[in-house]
Amino acid sequence: MSNQVKKYEPEFYKKRKTYTRTYKGDANDSSVQAVVQGHVSKCPDLVTNDTAVQGYIINLLKECIDCGVDGFRFDAAKHIETEDDGEYASDYWKNITTSASSYYTQKTGDDLYIYGEILNNCGADRSYSSYTKYINVTDNRTGDAVLYNVTRGKASTATNAKYKSGVAASNAVLWAESHDTYEGSSGSSGFSNTADV
């Protein structure tokens, strides 16, 4: 864990071994445990079912709201457990979104926008609906298909009334590209770099 955590959150740093998971595997889609407790990019995985960890996250979101932020994007959202994940389940999404949204509404009278990045699928046969009851989610496969078809001169086939994830349009976030579009074997566009586009 970074020494910056020690500087800015000394209490969290002292308890870092309690607040990070002991599971040593890398994140992958083979099992619920591997999806929600595996290490993403070799980073330690927070114990997001711990109420103290949730409290730190809620406080950070409130600080951001106080600075004028009106929405949040959770990177790698599929790697945070849902209420439907059996023995790995938690109330993280309910607690985080309810607390942040309530705080934002009290301050502004408006609704807070929150979405999470779910690349390719939720992994381990998990459902998007476990997330969409609290947040909107990305559908990179639809965006990748549009990009693929347009760059091959097939713009007419780029339009499709159906999202590849099966998520309702009101819950889906699409993009033309992201930092993951060209990322090694996890890149889903079929391009190795932007020069091909």
Q: Language-model segments: what does each one mean?
A:
Residues 4, 59-197:
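Active-site-proximal helices and loops of the catalytic beta/alpha 8
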Residues 1-55, 126, 130-150, 197:
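Glycan-binding loop/region signatures in secreted carbohydrate-active enzymes
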